[in-house]
């Protein structure tokens, strides 16, 4: 399944229509203005339109759990690891609203960054996340939306840059809440590379997936963000590039940080391992690359989609 993070400007259903136009079979959206703590309630008419359109597109079925591959990304304001009680409470309240909105819209997956332990330490941050989820799942008992902890570049006090930390978070949340089916993972290829999980070659990509499977369980991966990286491996730089034009899949010009696309090079990169892996076939693969046109004047989403599909055969 392939999709992109698309705008809901005008109406949420516009993202579905744009996704269909671009040739995708899933999509990622914000369900509200992600830069604001408060949001208007979902309009009932818009909800009906959204649900009808997802059924019309058959985007409400398939995917890793048979519920389709539509994804929502939670607000970047949320920090469930914060030691600041006011920020933590606001984050829990906003995350609660995000879960409610996904449940109303029948969006199966809600991706969010775990948080940052500014002013404390990693053990404290992990405990705050566990406590947050205990409250979140208490407030949303019986909901079906799966919250996906996203791997990060691991810069500074940001949590999620190591597989062992992702695994520990999920294990603690699942044990505390007795809701293992509601907590899963999202990986981002750019974040992986920048965090130090080098994806420069196909063999390295296979090794990264094998390590993730061993530590976290590939069955718990529900969403994959597919982005090339403007930063080198272990750079801790969270900047996305078009597929085959960054430090993962492209022949990057020294010092310039700009890539020159080569299909031959792309086929030797970690992207080839990810796209051809049978365990990832039904997982929504979401582009979060810059929304610009390619040199031919066409949306770069089309170019990136075409490049990924060239790799989506076993053992390319």
Per-segment meaning from a language model:
Residues 5-9, 32-34, 75-77, 115-117, ...:
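Active-site beta-loop-alpha junctions enriched in small/polar residues
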Residues 80-184:
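Active-site acidic/histidine proton-transfer and metal-coordination neighborhood
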Residues 159-163, 167, 193-282, 299:
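Gly/Pro-rich active-site loop or hairpin
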Residues 1-72, 80-100, 311-316:
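N-terminal pre-domain/capping segments
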Residues 294-314:
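C-terminal helical cap(s) of enzyme catalytic domains, especially alpha/beta-barrels
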Residues 17-24, 43-71, 98-106, 135-143, ...:
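Acidic (Asp/Glu)-rich catalytic clusters
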Residues 19, 73, 91, 102, ...:
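Conserved, mostly hydrophobic/aromatic
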